């Protein structure tokens, strides 16, 4: 009898803990198809942790993290096939459809196809846009037809800032150059499309966190996520800690949003949540705002 009471207490405690967790919106999640994994061994991260073995395992593990950490919405970018596969299996309606594009013609895309996908609600966020990897910037003329459509239909834009995969220029992204990750390179977009909802991904990375803050100071419509910075390496964690301290002091913390950028390592979602929660210079309200409130405002979510 005593054992049963203890078990009941533990179950009730776990249930209460799950219900009391802060709601989270993850503004930076990636989806994949099996072609992204191939037959090779799972990738290892900086810490030697192996990623998911295939696309379905990756989805299942990511969905489990959504449940565990009370992630109620997630902006998912990948190729359109992978995103739609996730949506079809998303019984809890968490997924916000994004699209991963390095170049304007990825996925055989053009402005006509793009606009139709927007109308059909197959694209709800234009991102992750990552011109950095394709050797361009979002301010270049080749991206303007898409941005005009986003402004017309009030579609948020998510743009990669900061650097990328170390050594990637020698392999899968030969056109990538570090200078292309400077947040200042999107300033012309902010000027040209003042009504556009836009957020930086990675908060300028390790390279330009101060540029990210200055840009947010000048352009009040600009937000940022913290994706990848919260988990991928000790150095990024150092930079994001300084970024959060500085942007809080500057008064723009209300435009900072949580993002994990789990890539092929779903465990990174929990690691990102835990690291943000460990920062004692942030108040509980600060954390609530970063985890949920700021993104809910940016996305114009209705309760």
Identify the role of each PLM range.
Residues 62-94:
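Mid-chain, structured segments of secreted extracytoplasmic proteins
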Residues 32-34, 80-84, 104, 132-134, ...:
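Active-site environment of divalent metal-dependent phosphoester hydrolases
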Residues 81-168, 175-177:
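Active-site gating/metal-coordination segments in enzymes
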Residues 124, 139-257:
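Catalytic pocket-lining loop regions of alpha/beta-barrel enzymes
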Residues 4-13:
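Sec-dependent N-terminal signal peptides
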Residues 2-3, 19-30, 36, 45-73, ...:
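Mid-to-C-terminal alpha-helical segments outside catalytic/metal-binding sites
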Residues 33-57, 94, 165-169, 220-223:
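Active-site gating loops and adjacent loop-to-helix segments of metal-dependent hydrolytic enzymes
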Residues 25-29, 74-76, 95-100, 125-128, ...:
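Hydrophobic faces of well-ordered beta-strands that scaffold small-molecule active sites
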């Amino acid at each position: 009898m005593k054992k049963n009471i203890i078990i009941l207490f533990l179950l009730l405690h776990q249930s209460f803990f799950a219900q009391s967790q802060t709601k989270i919106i993850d503004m930076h999640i990636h989806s994949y198809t099996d072609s992204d994994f191939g037959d090779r061994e799972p990738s290892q991260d900086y810490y030697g942790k192996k990623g998911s073995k295939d696309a379905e395992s990756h989805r299942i593990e990511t969905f489990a993290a959504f449940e565990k950490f009370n992630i109620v919405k997630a902006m998912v970018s990948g190729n359109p096939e992978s995103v739609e596969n996730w949506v079809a299996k998303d019984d809890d309606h968490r997924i916000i459809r994004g699209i991963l594009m390095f170049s304007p013609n990825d996925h055989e895309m053009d402005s006509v196809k793009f606009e139709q996908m927007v109308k059909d609600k197959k694209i709800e966020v234009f991102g992750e846009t990552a011109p950095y990897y394709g050797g361009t910037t979002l301010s270049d003329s080749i991206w303007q037809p898409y941005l005009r459509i986003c402004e017309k239909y009030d579609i948020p834009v998510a743009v990669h800032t900061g650097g990328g995969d170390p050594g990637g220029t020698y392999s899968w992204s030969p056109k990538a150059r570090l200078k292309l990750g400077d947040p200042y390179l999107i300033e012309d977009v902010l000027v040209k499309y003042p009504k556009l909802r836009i957020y930086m991904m990675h908060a300028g990375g390790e390279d330009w966190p101060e540029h990210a803050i200055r840009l947010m100071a000048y352009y009040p419509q600009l937000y940022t996520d913290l994706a990848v910075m919260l988990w991928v390496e000790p150095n990024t964690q150092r930079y994001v800690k300084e970024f959060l301290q500085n942007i809080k002091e500057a008064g723009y913390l209300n435009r900072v949003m949580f993002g994990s950028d789990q890539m092929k390592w779903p465990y990174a979602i929990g690691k990102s949540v835990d690291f943000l929660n460990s920062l004692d210079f942030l108040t509980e309200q600060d954390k609530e705002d970063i985890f949920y409130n700021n993104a809910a405002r940016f996305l114009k979510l209705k309760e």
